Amino acid sequence: MPKITAYIIAFNEAAKIEAAVNSVLWADEVLVADSNSTDNTVELAQALGARVVQVPFHGFGDLRNRTLEHCTHEWIFSLDSDERCTAEARDEILALVSGEPSHDAYLVPRRSYMMGRWIEGSGWYPNYRQPQLFRKTAMRYTLDPVHEGYELLTSKPVGHLTQAIHQFPFRNMAEVIHKMNRYSTLGAAKLTRKRASMASAFGHGLWAFIKHYIFKRGFKDGWAGFVIAFGNFEGTFYRYAKRYEETQNWQPPPSEKLTRPKP
């Protein structure tokens, strides 16, 4: 049977890394690509038997490509630290690679949870990202700093698994805000060839809210759906606002050296 490397990218994920690693202990190799975490992510992963390599962060696309260089086996299963493989997905993967797969890369459905519930709307299911199961020689990632795409190196089309993995993107509201701030900064770098203004920031942000809350039926997910839509408004607004800020060279008023007046 062909062997599988499960890789997980991580940065300061001590609160999540154990659950992620535990969910892929069935793989022949578990590799954690750490980007110089300052918490005990590395120690926790190693204690569970994962092999840890240090890969500096220069955008998610570059990070994933460099991680692939450290993967040992023919088949790759990609997992983020906020994701968990399920028993059903494990069984489907093992059965697939032990047979004669029709494809060299497979998209994996993700069942995402927020505020204690499964998010069925909001564009969060099946919520495919790049293929998460693929032959090592079949795919590379594009070099986008965030929301990276992929390039197939095979003539076969992408397949789809039927069994979902689980995703828990946010532990609390603080993580929602933190991730929005980080991703909007990374996303601003993708707008270098676009003109931005505060008006365009608001317009793009408003459309992001409407798209997720109305057209992607986020309203069906209760307050969680509203938070997701509002978070997309904020992330999109600040992505364009940060790009606009880069073009303005705003400066504070000139400082003065103030001493006590002479009598």
Where are these regions (language model features)?
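Cell-envelope/extracellular polymer assembly enzymes that use nucleotide-activated donors
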Residues: 3-5
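Short, well-formed alpha-helical segments that are part of the catalytic scaffolds
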Residues: 7-29
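Acidic helix N-cap motif at the loop->helix transition within catalytic regions
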Residues: 18, 39-48, 88-89
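A conserved acidic beta->alpha catalytic loop
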Residues: 23, 34-44, 80
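Short, structured coil segments at secondary-structure junctions
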Residues: 26, 47-49, 129, 154
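Conserved donor nucleotide-binding strand/loop of the catalytic core
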Residues: 42-70
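Catalytic-site signature of metal-activated, phosphate-bearing donor transferases
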Residues: 62-68, 77-79, 86-250, 257, ...
